[in-house]
């Protein structure tokens, strides 16, 4: 499957859980300059001036059946508000909008006014009036105004009402480059990078000071070793039968109550592009976006064991979103010992999904091989939030933390009870390669002299492991460090990747500009010039350039280059893109077919691109014509595309390249008309083909009559230096004679032309074919009309000289081709 790199929405309320200090006010600029591109930065809610109030009492307004006058304590004063909600309750805390408040749901700024003769000092708000969609609200939340559930009286009167709703925060949308999808597709991954940036900023004034000003919260980023203490051993058996599963953790939770998640959790998921489902599934999705660790929960009523194995050949599964798939032994499944209950790392199955009646679950946290997950997703043409993270690589060291955090939330938000210790089965740990980094090399690459201690501190802030313990002072610039990137960083493999991280922390925008030191001024090579000028020539001739994929289908390959060794992609994106092309004509036929299906005719396209063979790549030029080549308003007749027009364009190209091509009649190309195709020869080597499309090809690809030509642009051709020979202006006139004759169709004009030139090598300067006439009664002969140009630089040709030449030409043509003069 092919797609653009994903974006990641960072939610302030989740991000600040991982910082012990308030977040920087210029977080957007810091992110854009030091981490990755910021695509958007905006407040989660546009609502303003909303506070928490408490209903003291309410009474009906005289003359109205629904309206009540409500006395509300806003913490600083008591206000009277007219409200028509049916769910008013004394003592309940509510959302109060006063004069000047802006409500996103109704897109209005409030003003105090009289209603039924009673002055109203604001408005009590429903969630819908705050712009929250009712689709994911409970029936109770949709009924009237919103009533805070605050049994412990933790929400202060007069405080910002958006805070307990989880709406008082910003959204930072990251545009992720492919190499950073793995570690920045989570709040914790971004928090760790942001911590490194903030720490490096605080140490810029004192390079020798260690950067320890910004730390992530221990309570959020470390496991509690006592959380599962004093629990009995689990009866659940876990067995891993495949190396693609490095680690599998499972925990049984009982007494689960399936219900909607708290509003703050639903809002967080919605802002991340994930629809809330129920509290259990929502908790696993929260862990997904916060820690980057995919989890899965099974309804475990009938599950006694977990077995991770390869899928069986032709094994059928139905996913929880009711998609049916047929698997093979290259896929990985989670089973209950007998049947599959999940497609590993991608999606759960319908039978074991969480239902409204579920009371007992098994929570799964595992590490699966990125290659295995990616191959299965490509084959099945499916992708999920979980598979995206697994195939890009997750941080295996975070699995225990994410697993424990999910268990805590299941106890808190789903009334779950952990009755047994989790089952932890680990086969192996993923490691990053050790990289040797020379500090002098860092300076040369970045172009800025960095203090060795500063380099070390920056690497430590980024969670690199440095395996050298030597003191890094100002004089040790040539010291070599052996280090490893953190497990979340799958993109750091060589020393240049490490230098890229150091450059980010320094700030690419702060790198001083330097003049490039090169011995000579750069210029285009002769080959590059010829390619560029060739493009201009074809555009000036009325062609449109196309740029097509290098990958084609096996069907298209067989049509143009059958029975040849080819290069096939191991994991093609689709069946239409699986073989590297050996001819540009296959791509041009697809372009013509696309145009003709949309009733676009009279087209002329060309492409200059690479073709691929087992041992080499070749640059080629191909062009295609169909319909009218020239649509003229000034001439009486349009110029239609034909074999001769195509040949004329090719002659223009060969003249531009300074080469002489010869034509060899052939019938070896099945996609061309058998009577109208020729190989192109240069120095007696076949370097191309020209011809008219075969009627069967036209039918198959919905083409009108078209003409194609392809020419291999070898280095010899492109590196040919065009030479120009200047001649004086002729002093003597040119003599022109026409010659028409009947000749067998088996003889080509090229053969006849060569014979004529050999007969009069000096005075004949040009031979043109200006008419061809097919005899109606026979297909064996046709009439050719030639125009011959005679000229001599040294003298004026006499009539008898020209007649003598014409006699020699005629006799030679009769001798070799048995012509009949007309």
Swiss-Prot record:
Domain FDX-ACB residues, every copy: 730-822
Domain (B5): residue spans on this chain: 430-513
Gene Ontology cellular component terms for the protein in this record: phenylalanine-tRNA ligase complex
EC number: 6.1.1.20
Transmembrane segments: none
Signal peptide (residue range): none
Main subcellular localisation: cytoplasm
Residue segments, region Disordered: 201-224
Superkingdom of source: Bacteria
Name of the protein described by the UniProt record: Phenylalanine--tRNA ligase beta subunit
Catalytic reaction list: tRNA(Phe) + L-phenylalanine + ATP = L-phenylalanyl-tRNA(Phe) + AMP + diphosphate + H(+)
Protein family: Belongs to the phenylalanyl-tRNA synthetase beta subunit family. Type 1 subfamily.
Recorded name of the encoding gene: pheT
Enzyme category, top tier: ligase
Binding site for Mg(2+): 491, 497, 501
HAMAP family for this protein: Phe_tRNA_synth_beta1 (MF_00283)
Cofactor binding notes: Binds 2 magnesium ions per tetramer.
Originating species: Onion yellows phytoplasma (strain OY-M)
Quaternary structure (record): Tetramer of two alpha and two beta subunits.
Cofactor: Mg(2+)
Compartments where found: Cytoplasm
Organism classification: Bacteria, Bacillati, Mycoplasmatota, Mollicutes, Acholeplasmatales
Matching InterPro entries: aa-tRNA-synth_II/BPL/LPL (IPR045864), B3/B4_tRNA-bd (IPR005146), DNA-bd_dom_put_sf (IPR009061), Fdx_antiC-bd (IPR005121), Fdx_antiC-bd_sf (IPR036690), NA-bd_OB-fold (IPR012340), Phe-tRNA-ligase_IIc_bsu (IPR045060), Phe-tRNA-ligase_IIc_bsu_bact (IPR004532)
């Amino acid at each position: 499957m092919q797609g653009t790199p994903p974006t990641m929405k960072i939610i302030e309320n989740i991000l600040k859980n991982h910082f012990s200090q308030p977040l920087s006010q210029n977080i957007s600029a810091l992110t854009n300059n030091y981490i990755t591109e910021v695509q958007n930065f905006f407040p989660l809610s546009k609502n303003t001036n909303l506070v928490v109030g408490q209903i003291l009492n309410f009474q009906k307004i005289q003359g109205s059946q629904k309206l009540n006058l409500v006395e509300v304590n806003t913490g600083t004063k008591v206000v009277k508000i007219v409200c028509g909600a049916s769910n008013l309750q004394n003592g309940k805390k509510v959302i109060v909008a006063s004069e000047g408040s802006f409500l996103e749901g109704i897109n209005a700024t409030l003003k105090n006014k009289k209603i039924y003769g009673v002055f109203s000092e604001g408005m009590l708000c429903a969630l819908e009036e705050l712009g929250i969609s009712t689709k994911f609200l409970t029936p109770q939340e949709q009924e009237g105004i919103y009533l805070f559930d605050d049994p412990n009286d933790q929400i202060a009167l007069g405080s910002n009402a958006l805070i307990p709703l989880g709406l008082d925060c910003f959204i930072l949308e990251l545009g992720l480059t492919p190499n950073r999808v793995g570690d920045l597709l989570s709040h914790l991954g971004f928090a760790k990078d942001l911590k490194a940036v903030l720490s490096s900023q605080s140490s810029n004034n004192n390079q020798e000071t260690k950067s320890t000003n910004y730390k992530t919260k221990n309570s959020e980023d470390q496991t509690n070793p006592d959380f599962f203490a004093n629990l009995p051993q689990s009866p659940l058996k876990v067995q891993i039968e495949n190396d693609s599963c490095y680690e599998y953790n499972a925990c049984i939770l009982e007494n689960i109550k399936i219900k909607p998640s708290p509003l703050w959790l639903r809002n967080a998921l919605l802002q991340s592009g994930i629809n809330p489902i129920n509290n259990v599934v929502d908790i696993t999705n929260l862990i997904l976006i916060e820690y980057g660790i995919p989890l899965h929960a099974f309804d475990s009523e009938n599950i006694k064991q977990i077995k991770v194995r390869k899928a069986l050949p032709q094994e059928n599964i139905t996913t929880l979103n009711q998609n049916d798939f047929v698997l093979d032994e290259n896929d990985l499944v989670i089973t209950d010992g007998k049947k599959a209950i999940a497609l590993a790392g991608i999606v759960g199955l319908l039978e074991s999904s969480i239902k409204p009646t579920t009371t007992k679950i098994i929570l799964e946290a595992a590490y699966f091989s990125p290659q295995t997950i990616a191959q299965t997703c490509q084959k099945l043409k499916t992708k999920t939030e979980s598979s995206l993270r697994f195939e890009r690589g997750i941080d295996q060291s975070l699995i225990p933390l994410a697993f424990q955090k999910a268990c805590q939330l299941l106890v808190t938000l789903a009334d779950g009870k952990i009755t047994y210790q989790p089952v932890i089965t680990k086969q192996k740990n993923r490691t990053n390669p050790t990289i040797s980094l020379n500090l002098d090399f860092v300076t040369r690459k970045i172009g800025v002299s960095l203090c060795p201690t500063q380099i070390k501190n920056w690497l430590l802030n980024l969670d690199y492991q440095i395996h050298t313990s030597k003191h890094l002072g100002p004089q040790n610039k040539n010291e070599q460090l052996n280090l490893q990137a953190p497990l979340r960083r799958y993109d750091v493999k060589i020393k240049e990747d490490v230098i890229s991280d150091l450059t980010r922390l320094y700030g690419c925008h702060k790198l001083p500009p330097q003049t490039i030191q090169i011995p000579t001024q750069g210029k285009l090579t002769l080959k590059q010039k010829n390619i560029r000028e060739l493009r201009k020539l074809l555009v000036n001739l009325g062609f449109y350039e196309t740029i097509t994929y290098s990958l084609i289908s096996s069907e298209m390959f067989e049509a143009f280059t059958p029975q040849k060794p080819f290069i096939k992609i191991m994991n093609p994106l689709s069946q239409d893109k699986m073989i590297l092309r050996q001819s540009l004509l296959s791509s041009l036929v697809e372009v013509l077919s696309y145009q003709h299906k949309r009733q676009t005719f009279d087209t002329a396209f060309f492409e200059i691109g690479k073709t691929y063979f087992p041992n080499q790549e070749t640059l080629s030029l191909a062009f295609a014509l169909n319909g009218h080549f020239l649509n003229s308003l000034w001439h009486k007749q349009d110029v239609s595309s034909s074999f001769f027009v195509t040949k004329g364009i090719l002659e223009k190209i060969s003249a531009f390249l300074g080469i002489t091509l010869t034509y060899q009649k052939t019938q070896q190309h099945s996609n061309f008309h058998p009577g109208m195709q020729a190989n192109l020869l240069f120095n007696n080597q076949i370097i191309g083909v020209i011809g008219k499309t075969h009627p069967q090809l036209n039918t198959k690809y919905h083409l009108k009559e078209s003409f194609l030509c392809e020419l291999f642009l070898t280095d010899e051709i492109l590196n040919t230096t065009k030479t120009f020979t200047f001649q004086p202006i002729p002093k003597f006139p040119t003599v022109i004679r026409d010659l028409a004759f009947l000749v067998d169709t088996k003889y080509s004009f090229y053969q006849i032309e060569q014979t004529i030139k050999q007969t009069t090598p000096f005075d004949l300067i040009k031979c043109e074919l200006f008419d061809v006439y097919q005899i109606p009664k026979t297909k064996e002969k046709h009439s050719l009309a030639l125009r011959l140009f005679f000229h001599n630089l040294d003298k004026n040709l006499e009539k008898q000289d020209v007649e003598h030449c014409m006699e020699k030409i005629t006799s030679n043509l009769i001798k070799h081709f048995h012509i009949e003069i007309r």
